[in-house]
Amino acid sequence: MTDSSSHSADQRRSDERRSDNIQGRLLWSPSPDHAAKTEVTSFAAYVKARTGFDWSGDFQALWRWSVDHNVDFWDHFWDWHGVIGDKGDRRIENGSAMPGARFFPDATLSYAENMLANADDRLAISAHCEDGRHVRLTRAELKDRVMRLAGWMRDRGIGRGDRVAAYIANIPEAVIAMLATSAVGGIFSSCSPDFGLGGASDRFGQIEPRLLIACDGYSYAGKTFDRMGIVRELAAAMPSVEAVLIIPFMSDTPNMSGLPAPTLFDDAQGDSPLDDFQRVGFNDPLYILYSSGTTGAPKCIVHGVGGVTLQHAKELRLHSDVTGEDRLFFFTTCGWMMWNWMVSGLMVGTPIVLYEGNPFHPGPERLWQMAAQDGITHFGVSAKYIDAVRNAGYLPRQHKDLSAMRMMMSTGSPLSAEAFEFIYDEINADLQLCSISGGTDLISCFVLGSPTQPVHAGEIQTRGLGMAVDILDEDGQPITGEQGELCCLKPFPSMPVKFWNDPGDAKYRAAYFEHFDGIWRHGDWATLTQRGGIIIHGRSDA
């Protein structure tokens, strides 16, 4: 009789040998017609008309131009995308300093204003819950609810620089709360309600929010979890909290006793909406996100309005080819930066699809059923989710019509070459698979997809435009075809504005810039391939 642990080890070795055989195999190529119609081709034509630079359809040539002329790149992208705001005269100050560089230091804009432009009857949000609830909001309905809540905030003195903390499920109210906070010039910070009291208070307690927004509970895998007790303790633990908004997500009549100035979320959307958006500086805070906290209290990472706006628009349009004709979904909670990234889809006119709950409830078909129902074109999940679907023996395209899906995105951990092959064999043979990698630290990606390049098994397609990413050896020298440290050699707009409560930027510098002086070392082992692709091997700072 074979020992089970021995069998498991044999299976792993077999999988590893198979993955080695698949690694680098060509799995998909864009047709010339497809490439010609992409957003990045439109942008490249814009650049050629203004600078004379001709990419000749070569994405890697465009990448090289974008990092050699990184300030020009971001300046041209602002204009091509049509950022709503005043760009100001200066494009950068302290241009080579890492940290210290500031893009568009004179610019003013509002993230919410950019997100809520063209408030018409087109779909904005399609939100699903594991229990079958489904809510849809048009762009006009979304803006109306945002401006009403923003008016309530304004009337209570919440404005520029004030923090709003949200202990919240992945539901439309989360998007509304975030946009209302931005509309008044505030700073939004969120975590999901599966966090316990310690996890939530360790994060929110550091930033001293004036307003706490919370849902009364959540459900997962068919079980209901009441969170009102934790909400009371959380509010009590933060003397800065002046009021609490409660979203009755699991109960129509949540018990709000013991809370400071409690109000139901819908009751805060009154008859005195905000008339106009509060524009703030390009480098003023929009979000506070958090490190994992595995080596102490979570670090509070502050991201700026302009950096998020520019970087997300770039990644959505130029790398992911998202347009107003698409449907964008990423399986995430409000405690992961992919929520912030996905929500930015509203800025490019695409409806976003939310899912709250267990992605395997009642079975592995759940998200694929939703994808078919909503006609999702851009479908994002974690690499671990893909592995779970494979291990469950579920073959999505045998059960659901996924013909609308033209891009899959995977992140959170490296996607194996075998998982690449599974996606093309069992989900859709004619889609672009984008394994992407970046993180909370930059609220975006260092390496991601290219709609005009082929997909090779086990490889991320390209480095981000405007991102001077390279792989360095232990002496800080660039290397190709060998493992090294993934680094960024030049400033970029979505670098953190700062860490909260970090005098002199000591923690900020220690986090990224001390291993190689003045260079962002990200903490990933990676290999740059000869064709410009990236293979992520795992953490180098674990």
What role is predicted for each listed range?
Residues A49-D54, A112-T138, S251-N255:
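AMP-dependent adenylate-forming
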Residues T350, I376-V381, R390-V455, A468:
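Gly/Ser/Thr-rich phosphate-binding loop
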Residues E208-L212, G229-V244, D326-L328, V353, ...:
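Conserved helix-loop-beta element of the AMP-binding
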